[in-house]
Amino acid sequence: MKKVFLMIALLLTMCMTTKAQAAVYGDVDGDGHVTINDVTVLYNYILNDDMTYFSTSDVDGDGYVTSGDVTVVYNILLGLIPQEDTHEYVDLGLPSGTLWATMNIGANAPEEFGDHFAWGETTPKEVYDWSTYQWCNGRWNKMTKYCTISTHGNNGFTDGKTELDPEDDAASVNWSSQWRMPSKEQIDELRTKCTWTWTTSNGVKGYRVSRNGKSIFLPAAEGYSGSILSSGNLGYYWSRTLGDTRSYYANYLYFHSTSVTAEAFERSSGCTVRAVRVSQK
């Protein structure tokens, strides 16, 4: 079995544009073709000038394989090219430097409700209750992740986690790693450091939240319990922070026309998400 080494830079485009790195193998047939990731490439074809042949006893003077079956070893170079983030935010001049998104996850305009999520889940669904909740074994006292109280965990389970991991964060998963669901502290800061004005924007009721001459609009997007969406112009916005005294609760922002509070709510319920990021100044 003959061998020849070659270098290929492979560009993959996904949510992030990446170059991957690995040592992998492909088979070259008797006609001098190599199959790489199911793509047949001629030996004398230089792909973006990144394919290189090394002179060895298995390669002729021109740098090409002459005959026989060979095993080809090639490398894929690793690099990260971040895709441009198109999600808009507002700098309200908050002490923490937190930047708030202009619309909810799943929305296309500030007045749209967007998607509803159970806490720690990253896709919307039809029914929001304990039987469909990802992080329990069918009941509120059988948590399987994010549990600090043994009587609320499945068979006494605890893991000490009080904030969502990025892979369970609806903002990070649906937008990018630059975004997070807000912490309880970030919600408290928004609630106490800004002016909240109940208003109607493009026919949708909600709060205009203002500071430093700038503002965001939070629609009263309601919330799901089971398959029922609440009514009454209410707002339920998840934080990424677990409840303090009940591991089956998580902290959230709750409001109606005359009150804005930070409370805790059953994790299985469906609430909206307004993402945050931290200023890079």
Where are these regions (language model features)?
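C-terminal, surface-exposed recognition/capping segments
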Residues: 84-281
